[in-house]
A protein has these predicted regions:
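Extracellular structured ligand-interaction cores
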Residues: 82-86, 93-95, 103-105, 126, ...
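Generic recognition of flexible, low-complexity loop/linker segments
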Residues: 73-76, 84-86, 148-150, 177-180, ...
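Short, hydrophobic/amphipathic alpha-helical packing segments
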Residues: 63-68, 81-84, 175, 283, ...
Length: 632
């Protein structure tokens, strides 16, 4: 049963496609004190959800803030990352789903201040709360997913291998990646372009000095069954003569300050303006700009910097420099030193800036801070709407960094700028079910880690998780170690894992489609299925993929294996590379499983079967019908 409670006159986020009637009277389960709602938790209550966030699948014991943030450090103390996914389920004697539909800031204190208390504090006075009552967590997830609409489905080739790096700055770099994969007999379907391809970081441009014939290069790579996927950023460079800027200024399509002047911010190009994606005409205009690149043969994009990320605002920058000037001729001691550092460090993504510009909507002018979490969603929807007109439904790849529930109908997301840390393998595993609950099924991580330097063993272990994620992409940061698999001596081991990805795709793709069409989980915590098994419910490092297989990746350096809990009897299938080297029936209970760097262990459930394709160099070469089956 779904109950909808409305407070004030909320802005319609369009997260919900079929709104139930509004309930009258007080909201049950919670005590209301102003805009704070409190819930008394039992000792054994688990709280699942909240999408893309740090820490566990069980969110109990921490504070989380729903505020799309340009956050490069995904460490345990963080409270916000790139997405705003305000849906969670309390799993205990009471099974209760809660969705807070508010595009501004929302704080969740889930047993942090008081272990037995869950607090929701909403900054805005206008919002909606949906309560979903059900007999099980899975039934509540299914009901919520029906409420928010069908998730995005990309083309089949988007399930292939992707290679990316901030630093592919020329046609030669692209061709070197192609050569590296083909020469080493490594399968690949996509090469991603970061901001390097643009002319001075201007959206919908190509640097002709680096790419002498971009369209021809795209065509040649496509002949080799490789698609090129460029990045698009939210900020538009301030430059007279740049058509996107000129058109936006002429039509009033950029966000403005309270005086009605374009709000100038700093991002990659320096001084930039922000398209007003809550203005429907502006959104359509910006979305149609993707045609500049689709006309060159591009069939996929990734949207970035769309929280929106701000290095500074022009106004705030001036205030910071004026503040720093006060210290120029002084004896700078401890506290003054901290004050100077804070002035500079807090210049980026400053709350004061987010409260200083406005959107023109169907409901009139609205302050950005009140709808902040919709910015990336509406940018990506503008792209999706246009790409569907240009290329057709399910014919384009699109994913975004920032997101809000509702955007899942338009695109996927990636899990953001992680680091080459062993702990982030586990973090990315934990994110998957939380995102699935919120409708984001096409998702994946920067395999190997975006920031810092990866190592051969770290990348191999990360690939052992990535093999099962819908979005498979190796991505790294400018200045970090190059981490294409052919850069390492263990290229044979990488080849085996990549080949296994393609062999598993008949199962993974069917699982993905079933998850979308039936509003089911792609990756589930064990506790969603074995609801009366306390060990299963507390297991935070294993997942069910679909309803047939369980995975338990190794995520600790120098480990030769790991503890695995089996809630029921299963068949262990051990792959060395893409070949099966062992099948063993294992009883329910706690086990230690050895697993070498070039091995992946899959656990097949009873009365299930796992289809396997033959190896292929690309998705287009994959034979989806000539399959063998492992059964139990």
């Amino acid at each position: 049963m779904i109950k909808r409670f409305v407070f004030g006159k909320p802005f319609d986020t369009e997260a919900i496609i079929n709104k139930p009637k509004q309930e009258e009277g007080n909201i049950p389960y919670f005590e209301k004190n102003g805009n704070t709602f409190s819930y008394e938790m039992d000792d054994k209550d688990i709280v699942w959800g909240l999408g893309e966030n740090v820490r566990g699948m069980n969110k109990r014991g921490h504070k989380y803030t729903s505020w799309c943030s340009d956050e490069f450090e995904h460490s345990e103390e963080k409270q916000s990352l790139y997405g705003a996914h305000n849906f969670f389920i309390i799993d205990g004697k009471t099974k209760l789903g809660v969705f807070v539909d508010c595009p501004g800031r929302v704080d969740f204190d889930i047993g942090d201040t008081e272990y037995s208390k869950l607090y929701i504090t909403i900054e805005n006075s206008c919002f909606e709360i949906y309560l979903l009552e059900g007999s099980s967590v899975i039934s509540i997830v299914k009901e919520f997913r029906q409420l928010i609409g069908t998730s995005y489905i990309p083309p089949k080739w988007a399930f292939g291998i992707g290679q990316s790096r901030w630093g592919y700055g020329s046609e030669e770099d692209l061709l070197k990646v192609q050569e590296g994969y083909r020469k080493n007999n490594l399968p690949v379907d996509m090469i991603y372009l970061d901001i390097d391809y643009m002319d001075n970081f201007k959206d919908f441009t190509v640097d002709s000095n680096k790419y002498r014939d971009f369209k021809s290069t795209i065509s040649k790579l496509k002949e080799d069954k490789i698609r090129v996927i460029p990045i698009i950023d939210a900020g538009v460079k301030v430059e007279d003569g740049y058509s996107v800027y000129d058109e936006g200024i002429k039509n009033g399509f950029f966000c403005k300050d309270k005086e009605g002047k374009e709000f100038i911010v700093g991002v990659w190009p320096g001084k930039s303006v922000l398209p007003d994606f809550l203005n429907k005409a502006a959104a359509r205009w910006f979305g149609d700009k993707y045609k500049v690149l689709t006309d060159m043969g591009i069939e996929g994009f990734w949207n970035d910097m769309n929280e929106p990320a701000l290095f500074y605002s022009e106004k705030n920058k001036q205030e910071v420099f004026e503040h720093l000037a006060e210290y120029k001729d002084t004896n700078v001691g401890l506290y003054a030193n901290f004050a100077m550092k804070d002035a500079v460090n807090l210049m980026a993504n400053n709350l004061k800036d987010y409260k200083s510009f406005y959107h023109e909507t169907d409901k009139g002018k609205i302050c950005h801070a009140d709808v902040h979490n919709l910015y990336g969603y509406k940018m990506t929807k503008s792209a999706s709407d246009s790409l569907e007109r240009i290329l057709g439904k399910e014919k384009y790849l699109l994913f975004s960094r920032a997101s809000y529930i509702g955007m899942h109908r338009s695109s996927g997301i990636w899990m953001g700028d992680n680091k080459s840390w062993w702990s982030h393998i586990l973090l990315n595993l934990k994110m998957l079910p939380s995102l699935n609950m919120c409708g984001f099924i096409y998702t994946g991580a920067d395999l190997g880690g975006f920031g810092s330097d990866t190592t051969e063993d770290l990348l191999l272990r990360w690939y052992a998780l990535g093999v099962f994620l819908p979005l498979f992409r190796n991505h790294s940061c400018l200045g970090s170690r190059e981490q294409e698999p052919y850069q390492f001596k263990a290229v044979d081991k990488f080849r085996g894992l990549l080949n296994l990805r393609y062999r598993l795709l008949p199962y993974l793709y069917e699982t993905f489609i079933d998850s979308v069409k039936n509003n089911e989980m792609y990756g589930s915590p064990l506790g969603f299925v074995w609801t009366d098994d306390e060990d299963a419910k507390r297991c935070e490092d294993q997942l069910l993929i679909g309803d047939s297989i369980m995975i338990a990746p190794v995520y600790e350096q120098n480990a030769t294996g790991r503890h695995v809990y089996l809630p029921e009897e299963m068949k262990l299938i051990r792959f060395k590379g893409s070949e099966i080297i062992e099948e063993e029936l294992m009883g329910a209970g706690h086990n230690y499983i050895h697993c070498n760097l070039d091995e992946i262990c899959i656990f097949l459930r009873k009365n299930k079967k796992l289809p396997l394709a033959k190896e292929a160099a690309s998705i287009e070469d994959l034979d989806w019908k000539d399959l063998t089956y492992i059964e139990y």
